[in-house]
Swiss-Prot record:
Protein name per its UniProtKB record: Chloramphenicol acetyltransferase
Function: This enzyme is an effector of chloramphenicol resistance in bacteria.
Lineage: Bacteria, Pseudomonadati, Pseudomonadota, Gammaproteobacteria, Enterobacterales
Gene from which this protein is expressed: catB4
PROSITE patterns: HEXAPEP_TRANSFERASES
Catalytic activity annotation: chloramphenicol + acetyl-CoA = chloramphenicol 3-acetate + CoA
């Protein structure tokens, strides 16, 4: 099998590799998949590309996604754990005994990844999950619940380890929405974006926001 990636040290922009129309991506988000060899489309499991009535995978800008991360789509995939049997009889109706089975499929809603999110290698995000801006998902975490902005989570199931910043600093970051700035403004702010000076970054933003 030919590796889609040339090097483990350089990912590829999602905008350059995603072909599934049910995956929506922002600018500069990338997938670094060298160790698994496939493009990002294969990270979105069970997501039909030829249907528009399915849950979508929506990824913001400036997201970093590690090799082998996966996003489980297709709702409950035809399994109802609240029924007597979770078996998907409906999808095997060529068997006469199953011909009266009901369709158990249920949507979960769109899976939404915010901006500036870092998802570690082989993390798994379950259907319908919302991950807030600036969150960090630890490698091999199983994300079964929504993740708040700027939280660091890890484990199986994933639990909050800590917040990246103080509540005040998080509020400033969410107010600024730096990921929506023009490249010119990002260039000027780069020394602060590459630092922990959230207050200074906010002051810079106030100068051009007014």
């Amino acid at each position: 099998m030919t590796n889609y990636f040339d090097s483990p040290f350089k990912g590829k922009l999602l905008s350059e590799q995603v072909k599934n129309p049910n995956i929506k991506v922002g600018r500069y988000s990338y997938y670094s998949g060298y160790y698994h060899g496939h493009s990002f489309d294969d990270c979105a499991r069970y997501l039909f590309p030829d249907r528009d009535d399915v849950d979508k995978l929506i990824i913001g800008s400036f997201c970093s996604i590690g090799s082998g991360a996966s996003f489980i789509m297709a709702g409950n995939q035809g399994h109802r754990y609240d029924w007597a049997s979770s078996f998907p009889f409906f999808y095997m109706q060529e068997e006469p005994a199953f011909s009266s089975a009901l369709d158990a499929f249920q949507k979960a809603g769109n899976t939404v990844i915010g901006n500036d999110v870092w998802i570690g290698s082989e993390a798994m995000v379950m259907p319908g999950i919302k991950i807030g801006h600036g969150a960090v998902i630890g490698s091999r975490s199983l994300v079964t619940k929504d993740v708040e902005p700027y939280a660091i989570v890890g484990g199986n199931p994933a639990k909050k380890i800590k917040k990246r910043f103080t509540d005040e600093e998080i509020s400033l970051l969410l107010e600024m929405e730096w990921w929506n700035w023009s490249l010119e403004k990002i260039k000027a702010a780069m020394p602060m974006l590459c630092s922990s000076n959230i207050v200074g970054l906010h002051k810079y933003w106030l100068e051009f926001a007014v």
